[in-house]
Curated annotation (Swiss-Prot):
A lipid is attached at G206 (GPI-anchor amidated glycine). Interacts with EPHA8; activates EPHA8. The gene is Efna3. The keyword Disulfide bond applies. One of its GO terms (cellular component) is side of membrane. One of its GO terms (molecular function) is ephrin receptor binding. Disulfide bonds join C63-C102, C91-C150. The lineage of its organism: Eukaryota, Metazoa, Chordata, Craniata, Vertebrata. The keyword Glycoprotein applies. Pfam families: Ephrin. Residues 207-230 form a propeptide. This is Ephrin-A3. It comes from Mus musculus.
Length: 230
């Protein structure tokens, strides 16, 4: 029985608003991009690998994962950092900030996943904020002496719409807007003739022509009611 009021409410909601309700309180929906962070991913072993995202997109980082029969002490474990361009090129995390740690390589059922949302504003004081048109850099350092010591990735936040990014749009000037020190003489275009201005009708003493016939209409209505009652 509780589903009936909900169904009635959905029927009353205009169709254009349904996609907005499906987005939830966060606003615009973003796409998800997946990267498997391990030495077998050859893209991470070379400089220049770039993932392009839009504002409000998600980047899912999947840590190395092994089943119970996999290797023990030789399993890959990484600490991921967000660094600047110099730290990205030299694979130096000393000036970076620690983001995630992949240290549960034998997690049950599925690999550990970390997600980064490229949002313009963060609700947390220490949260990360991302801007359209900027590049961000991620590297990792292994906790064991592995052959592939440097895994790195570049993320480019592409140009999203203003509704996604939350940034105020730059106002576009109308075509008739002119620069400073330009005088516009509107009346000179009429060469002395008065422009045709529409005339506004105004009721006298606040009475409308329809109100003048009101007593007659009331009298006719009263006459018809009397005739029907007889």
């Amino acid at each position: 029985m509780a589903a009936a009021p909900l169904l009635l409410l959905l029927l009353l909601v205009p169709v254009p608003l349904l996609p907005l309700l499906a987005q939830g309180p966060g606003g615009a929906l973003g796409n998800r991009h997946a990267v498997y962070w391990n030495s077998s991913n050859q893209h991470l072993r070379r400089e220049g690998y770039t993932v392009q995202v839009n504002v409000n997109d998600y980047l899912d980082i999947y840590c190395p994962h092994y089943n119970s029969s996999g290797p023990g002490g030789g399993a890959e474990q990484y600490v991921l950092y967000m660094v600047n361009l110099s730290g990205y090129r030299t694979c130096n995390a000393s000036q970076g900030s620690k983001r995630w740690e992949c240290n549960r390589q034998h997690a049950s059922h599925s690999p550990i996943k970390f997600s980064e949302k490229f949002q313009r504003y963060s609700a947390f004081s220490l949260g990360y904020e991302f801007h359209a048109g900027q590049e961000y850099y991620y590297i990792s350092t292994p906790t064991h002496n592995l052959h592939w010591k440097c895994l790195r990735m570049k993320v480019f936040v592409c140009c999203a719409s203003t509704s996604h990014s939350g940034e105020k749009p730059v106002p576009t000037l109308p075509q008739f807007t002119m620069g400073p020190n330009v005088k516009i003489n509107v009346l000179e275009d009429f060469e002395g003739e008065n422009p045709q201005v529409p005339k506004l009708e105004k009721s006298i003493s606040g009475t409308s022509p329809k109100r003048e016939h009101l007593p007659l209409a009331v009298g006719i209505a009263f006459f018809l009611m009397t005739l029907l009652a007889s």
